[in-house]
Regions:
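N-terminal glycine/threonine-rich, aromatic-flanked beta-hairpin/loop signature
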Residues: 42-83
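Processing junctions and N-termini across compartments
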Residues: 15, 33-34, 60, 78, ...
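Bacterial N-terminal signal peptides
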Residues: 6-14
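Positively charged n-region of N-terminal signal peptides that target proteins for export
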Residues: 1-4
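Beta-sheet ligand-binding and adhesion/scaffold domains
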Residues: 81-123
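N-terminal helix-cap/turn-to-beta initiation motif at the start of protein domains
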Residues: 20-33, 122
């Protein structure tokens, strides 16, 4: 019986450790407030539909919230697996973010059906 409890504990630890393995650190370059496809003024006058906030665990925009299930950084690129909550229901997908020299970030989904440029808002 003790062996079963030990095994359950090990499986639980492995699952919780694996689930957080792809989390983004608090100082990661991808995090912050952005606008999509238009330069950000950051003075409150940016269109609501263009605003995007990326935190350590999710992307929040007017169309919905996408939670990071996994994130793998590779230099100036981050490949993510997300679950998005939309009014029509949940959707899972893969998104790649690429940091550009001009301080913008390219955003593209796996199937290349949606691309965008994210402009960082001044703090």
């Amino acid at each position: 019986m003790k062996l079963i409890y030990l095994l359950i504990g090990c499986v639980t630890l492995a699952l919780t450790t694996g689930a957080s393995a792809g989390a983004l650190s608090d100082d990661f370059w991808l995090l912050g407030d952005f606008t999509q496809n238009v330069p950000c003024k950051g003075d409150g006058s940016d269109p609501v539909e263009a605003r995007v906030k990326i935190s350590t665990d999710q992307i929040d925009s007017k169309v919905g919230v996408c939670k990071f299930l996994d994130a793998k950084a590779d230099g100036k690129r981050v490949n993510t697996h997300v679950e998005c909550q939309f009014p029509a229901g949940p959707l899972m997908g893969d998104i790649t973010f690429t940091q550009k020299p001009d301080n913008t970030i390219d955003f593209v989904d796996r199937d290349k059906t949606y691309t965008a440029t994210l402009y960082r808002c001044p703090k």
